[in-house]
Swiss-Prot record:
Organism: Shewanella sp. (strain ANA-3)
Protein name: Oxygen-dependent coproporphyrinogen-III oxidase
Reactions listed under catalytic activity: coproporphyrinogen III + O2 + 2 H(+) = protoporphyrinogen IX + 2 CO2 + 2 H2O
EC number: 1.3.3.3
Pathway: Porphyrin-containing compound metabolism; protoporphyrin-IX biosynthesis; protoporphyrinogen-IX from coproporphyrinogen-III (O2 route): step 1/1
Length: 302
């Protein structure tokens, strides 16, 4: 079994952050990312990079963090109690993109590595991550292409990989109190270590590198689509689901807050503007109704 090497993972993550920011700046064509580096008193730090008020992106945040601690927090040991009390290192790149145009979907991606140490014992480590898409208006072409890209990057690792992580994504990004998925899913994986370090790292890299391949064509296709107040209002209303999920259910958000992480970076995923409306119901036969009827539940897209 190959030996875990946090140094090579960190180098990949820093390079990935640079490449994704460059790609998003190119797609936007106007705004650029501002970098904000920070250190954590308990150990570690990171760099948050944020683009605001661009031509295409209202807000895009791409965060790198590498934090260390003497004891693992409750959120990380809830499903692995044997790890309680171990020291840990956690590193990752996490991003959320909120476009201006309601016809461009919001998206989220994350790749991460976790390693826990204990004197006299082998380190316990795993990779996690994925990417998911949250459209406001239904375009089957976009969703099928998104999932095809996800499936293609999984195929070298086995025929069962895409169906497994696609299903996990549908289950993870689900709002029980709304009885709907957050969007149309993608990939979600966690606790990945069974194949050994090298192969597990290869898969995490494939997911990180595949994100822009999946997202950029959708942005290019939709960024010039005209929209009005109705579409903007619906976009802001649906953004509320993002806030609800991240603050109530998301493991990464809860982990960051429980470990004394940097609040500005953790809440960077929040949309800059959002609205709630009491007892909203989409008009029958409308594109908004189609989103509810056909897109906010698990489907086999490819």
């Amino acid at each position: 079994m190959s030996v875990p090497d946090a140094t090579v993972v960190k180098a990949f993550l820093l390079d990935l952050q640079n490449r994704i920011c460059a790609g998003l700046e190119q797609l936007d064509g106007q705004a650029s990312f501002a970098a904000d580096s920070w250190t954590r008193t308990e150990g570690g730090g990171g760099t948050s990079r944020v683009l605001t008020q661009g031509a295409v992106f209202e807000q895009a945040g791409v965060n790198f963090s590498h934090v260390t601690g003497a004891a693992m927090p409750a959120s990380a040991t809830a499903h692995r109690p044997e790890l309680a009390g171990r020291s840990f290192e956690a590193m990752g790149v996490s991003l959320v993109i909120h476009p201006k145009n309601p016809y461009i979907p919001t998206t989220h991606a994350n790749v991460r590595f976790f390693i826990a140490h204990k004197d006299g014992a082998d380190p316990v480590w795993w990779f996690g991550g994925g990417f998911d898409l949250t459209p406001y208006y239904p375009f089957e072409e976009d969703v099928r292409e998104w999932h095809q890209t996800a499936k293609n990057l999984c195929l070298p690792f086995g025929d069962d990989v895409y169906p497994k992580y696609k299903k996990w994504c549908d289950e993870y990004f689900f709002l029980p109190h709304r009885n709907e998925t957050r969007g149309v899913g993608g990939l979600f994986f966690d606790d990945l270590n069974q194949a050994g370090f090298d192969k597990s790292f290869d898969f995490m890299q494939a997911v990180g590198n595949g994100f822009l391949t999946a997202y950029a064509p959708i942005v290019e296709r939709r960024k010039e689509t005209p929209y009005g107040e109705r579409e903007r209002d619906f976009q802001l209303y649906r953004r509320g689901r993002y806030v609800e999920f991240n603050l109530v259910y998301d493991r990464g958000t809860l982990f960051g807050l429980q470990t004394g992480g940097r609040t500005e970076s953790i809440l960077m995923s929040m949309p800059p503007l959002v609205r709630w409306q009491y007892a909203y119901t989409p008009e029958a036969g409308s594109p908004e109704a189609e989103l509810y009827d056909n897109y906010l539940k698990p489907r086999d897209w490819v």
